[in-house]
């Protein structure tokens, strides 16, 4: 059972609720969404029932849900299928982050800065597709006074040579790929 801290709000000022977590987890684990990392909820009671199929691949329990309940606005109750020694590590993974139902009903909720709502330290200011995503400090973040970087730019590139060049000349501080010929 988890109790949310007081004063948590989304970047648009609405309160973060236990219901946001319950909705997000049910959504991420659902066969309908088939999220890439939805399997990470397999440790939560109810997941196996959600994904049980007959020999033809038809879901046996279309109404099954995770055993995750918002007891009130601030209290989330979670029942795992078994003891999970790495539970806290799972909770740190983005698949476990809350999302609001009214926000994700918009297809562009995660790709359009005008509809992007979050509760983390940064929010999306702009996204130039195939170029750069710019994040800015979220003034509504519960610990905003401790966030020292005002802006973060994520440069997007499929070209490992371009990435390495930008890293070497100091334009980029971090890259996630290097050209194969640079690996010894």
Annotated model-derived regions:
Residues 3, 16, 20-22, 29, ...:
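Surface-exposed binding/hinge segments that line
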Residues 4-5, 80-81, 138, 157, ...:
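Active-site-proximal beta-strand/loop segments in catalytic clefts of secreted hydrolases
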Residues 8:
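Short basic (Lys/Arg) and small-residue
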Residues 18-26, 65, 88, 121, ...:
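Extracytoplasmic/secreted envelope proteins and their assembly/folding machinery
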Residues 34, 38, 146, 178-184:
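Local pocket/hinge segments that shape ligand/substrate recognition
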Residues 54, 63-65, 73-74, 80-151, ...:
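Gly/Pro-rich hinge or "lid" segments in bacterial periplasmic/extracellular proteins
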Residues 125-136, 153-184:
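Extracellular/periplasmic solute-recognition and catalytic clefts
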């Amino acid at each position: 059972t988890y109790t949310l801290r007081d004063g948590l709000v989304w970047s648009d000022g609405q309160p973060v609720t236990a219901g946001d977590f319950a909705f997000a987890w049910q959504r991420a684990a659902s066969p309908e969404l088939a999220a890439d990392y939805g399997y990470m909820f397999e440790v939560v009671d109810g997941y196996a029932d959600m994904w049980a199929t007959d020999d033809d691949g038809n879901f046996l329990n279309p109404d099954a849900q995770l055993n995750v309940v918002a007891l009130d606005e601030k209290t989330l109750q979670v029942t795992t299928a078994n003891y999970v020694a790495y539970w806290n590590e799972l909770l740190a993974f983005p698949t476990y982050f809350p999302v609001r139902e009214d926000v994700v009903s918009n297809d562009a909720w995660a790709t359009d800065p005008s509809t992007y709502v979050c509760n983390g330290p940064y929010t999306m200011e702009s996204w130039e597709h195939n170029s750069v995503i710019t994040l800015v400090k979220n003034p509504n973040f519960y610990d905003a006074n401790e966030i020292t970087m005002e802006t973060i730019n994520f440069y997007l590139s499929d070209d490992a040579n371009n990435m390495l060049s930008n890293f070497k000349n100091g334009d980029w501080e971090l890259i996630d790929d290097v050209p194969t010929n640079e690996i010894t």
